[in-house]
């Protein structure tokens, strides 16, 4: 019995150029997160969602304090209708 391609456990093989482009994009995202954390910038829920590449509603549903990769994301305060978040680098 043959398994269909891309079944659970299989990874889609992209051309090398596309994989390299994805890694470049990932590194740029991580650099941005690092700069946001290092400079103490506060960012909105929409900006956190953009950084993490998730739905904006998923940001607030995670709670007030949660890990993401090498950072902890914490809810700091509300300004008007915006919730502001802070990234803190963890080792």
Feature locations, PLM:
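Long, charge-rich, low-complexity intrinsically disordered regions
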Residues: 1-35, 46, 57, 80, ...
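Polyanion-binding surface elements
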Residues: 36-54
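Major-groove DNA-recognition helix of helix-turn-helix-type DNA-binding domains
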Residues: 56-87
